[in-house]
Design a protein with these regions (language model features):
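Short acidic-hydrophobic, aromatic-tinged amphipathic segments that line or gate anion-handling sites
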Residues: 110-114
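Intrinsically disordered or compositionally simple regulatory linkers and C-terminal tails
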Residues: 2-7, 128
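STAS-typified acidic loop motif
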Residues: 6-41, 59
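Residues at or immediately preceding the N-termini of alpha-helices
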Residues: 36, 115-116
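Amphipathic alpha-helical interaction surfaces in cytosolic regulatory modules
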Residues: 33-109
Length: 129
């Protein structure tokens, strides 16, 4: 089970949960300049406060992401890699998969079928508990 540490009120805003020193961000809408800054700020607070090592992005409900979303992901990568952590993606739609490939984000993160698979894999690689 996931330990819920923050739940945003709006149905369109992402859920943030923690397991094995990994922050799972489950998106419920597309990621663009309207929401990327808010997501970044919440993720940063949780990563710093919770001494979290990894971040998993669950894109199951995402069909579009602009450059703001790409920047938000790269920023979280830079934040966790400094402490030996990793980022991963799961639930990737064909549309988002194409964006992640074109942007080169797959060079810094792996893709998994489920959040469970992603959390287990990166926790083992980084020693998360």
């Amino acid at each position: 089970m996931y330990q819920e540490i923050a739940l945003v009120n709006s149905e369109e805003e992402p859920d943030f949960t923690v397991r094995k020193r990994t922050l799972l961000i489950k998106f419920h809408s597309d990621i663009d300049h309207h929401n990327a800054v808010q997501i970044r700020m919440k993720a940063d607070r949780l990563i710093e406060r919770g001494d979290l090592r990894n971040v998993v992005f669950d894109f199951e409900e995402v069909h579009f992401m602009d450059s703001s979303g790409i920047g938000m992901i790269m920023g979280r990568y830079k934040q966790v890699i400094f402490h030996g952590g990793k980022i991963a993606a799961c639930g990737v739609s064909n549309e988002v998969d194409r964006i992640l490939k074109i942007s080169g984000l797959y060079r810094v993160m792996d893709k998994f079928d489920s959040a469970e698979d992603a959390i287990e894999a990166i926790s083992q690689r980084t020693g998360g508990r």
